[in-house]
């Protein structure tokens, strides 16, 4: 029975599925990430209205160029996130505020133009997981790097750090950390598309080490400039 269950899950990952599409500008949504989105494009609002009458599942995929108003298949990245709508609020100006939760990584296949919105064929993607001990060690290192970064970068709330420290799954830990790091959209998407959890953790650890180093250099420069200014003022 156990083997049958594993095979069933594996096969499901290779089944072509279909959902309405919501193209995103300037944000990458990771699995387990809960985030509010403000939606204004007609096709996107129609897609949301459609899924609210069914199972509330929608496919989120980031645009390569946020300036494009009516994106085609080549205008979005190759991987997105199967997500669920937690809450939807229609605003007075005609736009929509929606609270979404990322669920699973998905490979984007084809766009299907409906009358009022876009649907998308896709396949779910599995994480590539190595030995548990190695992943747990890397997860602990990643959390320590995040603690250090949080102590010098006030843009990351302490509540975020505490919620990540409560996580047990290395894949979820890597995704939650990546979603809060200061990276370009293409850099974030590259980490999103890293299905090997060990490599994903390695990547975010390097990003955090680099960001910590940059912040340290900036602080030292500001300190030297401040000291020089104070010295100049004393001389006058």
Which residues fall in each region the model found?
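N-terminal low-complexity, acidic/polar interaction/targeting segments
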Residues: 6-236
């Amino acid at each position: 029975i156990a083997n049958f269950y594993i095979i069933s899950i594996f096969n499901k990952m290779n089944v072509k599925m279909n959902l309405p599409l919501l193209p995103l500008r300037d944000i990458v949504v990771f699995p387990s990430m809960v985030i509010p989105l403000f939606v204004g494009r007609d096709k996107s609002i129609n897609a949301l209205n459609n899924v609210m009458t069914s199972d509330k599942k929608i496919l989120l995929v980031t645009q390569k160029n946020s300036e494009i108003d009516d994106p085609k298949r080549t205008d979005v990245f190759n991987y997105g996130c199967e997500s669920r709508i937690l809450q939807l609020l229609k605003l007075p100006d005609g736009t929509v505020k929606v609270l979404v939760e990322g669920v699973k990584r998905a490979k984007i296949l084809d766009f299907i133009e409906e009358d009022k919105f876009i649907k998308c064929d896709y396949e779910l993607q599995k994480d590539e997981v190595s030995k548990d001990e190695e992943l747990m060690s890397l997860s602990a290192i990643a959390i320590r790097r995040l603690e250090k970064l949080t102590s010098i970068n006030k843009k990351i709330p302490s509540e975020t750090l505490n919620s990540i420290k409560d996580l047990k799954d290395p894949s979820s830990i890597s995704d939650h950390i990546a979603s809060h790091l200061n990276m370009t959209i293409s850099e974030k998407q590259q980490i999103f598309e890293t299905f090997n959890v060990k490599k994903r953790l390695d990547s975010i650890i390097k990003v955090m080490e680099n960001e910590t180093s940059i912040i340290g250099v900036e602080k030292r420069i500001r300190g030297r400039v401040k000291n020089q200014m104070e010295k100049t003022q004393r001389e006058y």
